[in-house]
Amino acid sequence: MKISRQAYADMFGPTVGDKVRLADTELWIEVEKDFTTYGEEVKFGGGKVIRDGMGQGQLLAAEVVDTLITNALIIDHWGIVKADVGIKNGRIAAIGKAGNPDIQPDVTIAVGAATEVIAGEGMILTAGGVDTHIHFICPQQIEEALMSGVTTMIGGGTGPATGTNATTVTPGPWHMARMLQASDSFPMNIGFTGKGNVSLPGPLIEQVKAGAIGLKLHEDWGTTPAAIDNCLSVADEYDVQVAIHTDTLNESGFVETTLAAFKNRTIHTYHTEGAGGGHAPDIIKACGSPNVLPSSTNPTRPFTRNTIDEHLDMLMVCHHLDPSIAEDVAFAESRIRRETIAAEDILHDLGAFSMLSSDSQAMGRVGEVIMRTWQTADKMKKQRGPLPQDGPGNDNFRAKRYIAKYTINPAITHGISHEVGSIEVGKWADLVLWRPAFFGVKPTLILKGGAIAASLMGDANASIPTPQPVHYRPMFASFGSSLHATSLTFISQAAFDAGVPESLGLKKQIGVVKGCRTVQKKDLIHNDYLPDIEVDPQTYQVKADGVLLWCEPADVLPMAQRYFLF
């Protein structure tokens, strides 16, 4: 029996050779592989396959998956494939072909009476986003991020304190304990960074032992060469990451001074272009160092006609500056440069900038990491054309490069890629399901640890789930002890060994960071280009390996107003 390709796609979703448009962008992906056996596809519903004795077998709960996502189109750094995805005990158990092994061939995921089904036909499945630049200013950020498809948040803060409004720092053991206890209340994987700005090791060590998964160096606390060297030394000893916001004013040295202070040790440079902060005008040079793991924050993503004007006001508020003081205004203006922001677009497209994050409420929007990543990809395709690695008529490599920026690469950087960051067997089942027309903008379903934590949902008093008003609502994995079973709190190995979870009475699952200090840029997937960067100190023009980097600002973006009328 044969059916048309269109009929097949309508019934089971696209298969090999079919192309899917991502939202209203000009990005097209093509299915590279389909794990199904044609004619043996499983689908749930009245008169469908997953019924007793048909696609559902007689095996006990221990032998079948807890949850099955059927016929989903996976976009991940490793491929763009169609598959069934099985989840067991909160982790991804299998990616392959589901069904009843008693009567169906090639089954790699057994379905039984203990199996729940989520229909993935015609849907896109991605790993939950990993945002590694969080100012924990208000707890409401967490729900906002979750509803956008982010499932892991790393950063620092204590609430709307002036220090937190400017820096991603949870300072000292007392604040660290309070924030770890607070994190038990949220369906989100969370890790906190301590204050790295001190020139002796003791105050840093006590923060790591209290639970910090990393240390943050920020110019507002004094990012001197001595503080940098001390912080990296402690990080090397305790296997935690260091994130840095460098010295915009060049008071304690220039970009060359800071790079020398790194002494070839691994470090995550925040907003490496510089609008978010850093040596003016040439912190962007850092992305050419093999030990530097560079990221952007989302307000400069992508470069548009409004980017410059918006940034000046943002900066004055976030860094406690006074518009009546000439030096404060000069400080702000030194950070906002059209030329370096334009270059940032291109450096992302070349894979020289490896990650993208939010800078939540502190010159960044916590719910727009994913959207702005794909807006940047779309702008670059329109302005630069297909990448050399892309296949004919598709943007598969570009899609893999850009999705890696907010999933696997930040997870690798912060030592949590053994738990999250990709759709791979054994990892925590933090998964996001999207309708292609809403991809990157509004997810349909967000799973945490294999359970549904958030979803689009209609009127709770309606006779079916879909009547308006349809909006995002927390689901059962966001409540009670289910929340604790399906989300992770990340801490250092030193804190784990010291019994911090027990002493603080933490209830969520505990993840331990590891491998932070051996990561090099070459380890960041699809984003490991090491250009030789030059910045003209007068014109701010940027060159990479001798090539001028300039692109025009966008007047119109996809994934924007047409999606937010309601």
UniProtKB/Swiss-Prot annotation:
GO cellular component: cytoplasm
EC number: 3.5.1.5
Pathway involvement of the protein, from the record: Nitrogen metabolism; urea degradation; CO(2) and NH(3) from urea (urease route): step 1/1
Post-translational modification: Carboxylation allows a single lysine to coordinate two nickel ions.
GO molecular function: nickel cation binding; urease activity
Residue(s) carrying N6-carboxylysine: K216
Cofactor(s) named in the record: Ni cation
Keywords: Cytoplasm, Hydrolase, Metal-binding, Nickel
One Pfam family linked to the record: Urease_alpha
Residue span, Urease domain: 128-566
Localization per Swiss-Prot or TrEMBL: Cytoplasm
Active site: H319
InterPro entries found in the cross-reference section: Amidohydro-rel, Metal-dep_hydrolase_composite, Metal_Hydrolase, Urease_alpha_N_dom, Urease_alpha_subunit, Urease_AS, Urease_asu, Urease_asu_c
Binding positions for Ni(2+) 1 per the UniProt entry: H133, H135, K216, D359
Note on how the cofactor is bound: Binds 2 nickel ions per subunit.
Reaction(s) catalysed (UniProt annotation): urea + 2 H2O + H(+) = hydrogencarbonate + 2 NH4(+)
GO biological process, one term: urea catabolic process
Positions with a binding annotation for substrate: H218
Sequence positions that bind Ni(2+) 2: K216, H245, H271
Gene3D superfamilies named in the record: Metal-dependent hydrolases, Urease, subunit C, domain 1
Family: Belongs to the metallo-dependent hydrolases superfamily. Urease alpha subunit family.
PANTHER family associated with the record: UREASE
Identification of the protein by name: Urease subunit alpha 2
Organism: Pseudomonas syringae pv. syringae (strain B728a)
Classification lineage: Bacteria, Pseudomonadati, Pseudomonadota, Gammaproteobacteria, Pseudomonadales
